[in-house]
Amino acid sequence: MAGAKEIRTKIASVQNTQKITKAMEMVAASKMRKTQDRMAASRPYAETIRSVIGHLALGNLEYKHPYLEERETKRVGYLVVSTDRGLCGGLNTNLFKKLLSEMKDWSDKDVQCELALIGSKATSFFASVGGNVVAQVTGMGDNPSLSELIGPVNIMLRAYDEGRLDKLYVVTNKFINTMSQEPTITQLLPLPAGDDETLKKKSWDYLYEPDPKALLDILLRRYVESQVYQGVVENLASEQAARMVAMKAATDNGGSLIKELQLVYNKARQASITQELTEIVSGASAV
């Protein structure tokens, strides 16, 4: 059994770690609330433009944009959104696991995959496991801006425009609630038709001013950018929620460990006192 002094040192060490994890839990909770506000502010725009684009995909368009046309799938692209920091449980691991499973399905069909990575965790992961990485961006912090995402998005859109990609997806964690974050893979291009039954029952048609091509070129590009940005914001909210839960679990586990060490310490101290009393009694008997 370890000595009483050694056990006291371990207890002090765990208590110090517990203070750190508690502070990190509080910081994550504060950041999560701010990120949730940002997510709530951007979500109406993302959902509205997704709805409009869904109508377009179902409509009888005067001009058929390339982003609306299905192609034979030979190459697919993924915009992968991860975190820049760790200590957020299995958030990134679950996302990468889902992505690798889908990439394997494509590989079995002889379809090649290209990756544009957002976040240092995705960069380090695919540096170790391998992958055709064509773009990456890291260090966006807690206040990501669309301008920081334009680089990877433009690279993937250019590849799609030039026919080097036949499908484009965004991979991110969807924020459900504080305790639940769901890894999702959403198709961006070709434009998926709206899945709302009420939309499918209607015949959507549009008049474009001044020119359908110019309008759709801008609108569809903004659609892709908005969905990627919304994915980044939701992933950030998921990160802070997962980190808050992970740090709370670490703090609670620290408390349990302290109780166990305190019990061991009490037993060690009791054994030491018993031994001293035995030695005193033995010495007195010898006299």
UniProtKB/Swiss-Prot annotation:
Compartment list: Cell inner membrane
CDD domains in alphabetical order: F1-ATPase_gamma (cd12151)
Cellular compartments per GO CC: plasma membrane; proton-transporting ATP synthase complex
Biological process annotations from GO: proton motive force-driven plasma membrane ATP synthesis
This protein's UniProt keywords: ATP synthesis, Cell inner membrane, Cell membrane, CF(1), Hydrogen ion transport, Ion transport, Membrane, Transport
Gene3D superfamilies named among the record's database cross-references: 3.40.1380.10, ATP synthase, gamma subunit, helix hairpin domain
GO MF annotations, alphabetized: ATP binding; proton-transporting ATP synthase activity, rotational mechanism
Pfam families: ATP-synt
Keyword Ligase tagged: no
PROSITE patterns: ATPASE_GAMMA
InterPro entries, per the entry: ATP_synth_F1_ATPase_gsu, ATP_synth_F1_gsu, ATP_synth_F1_gsu_CS
Membrane topology: Peripheral membrane protein
Protein's UniProt keywords contain Cell inner membrane: yes
Primary localization: membrane
Assembly description: F-type ATPases have 2 components, CF(1) - the catalytic core - and CF(0) - the membrane proton channel. CF(1) has five subunits: alpha(3), beta(3), gamma(1), delta(1), epsilon(1). CF(0) has three main subunits: a, b and c.
Entry similarity comment: Belongs to the ATPase gamma chain family.
Protein role: Produces ATP from ADP in the presence of a proton gradient across the membrane. The gamma chain is believed to be important in regulating ATPase activity and the flow of protons through the CF(0) complex.
Name of the protein in its database record: ATP synthase gamma chain
Organism, as annotated: Photorhabdus laumondii subsp. laumondii (strain DSM 15139 / CIP 105565 / TT01) (Photorhabdus luminescens subsp. laumondii)
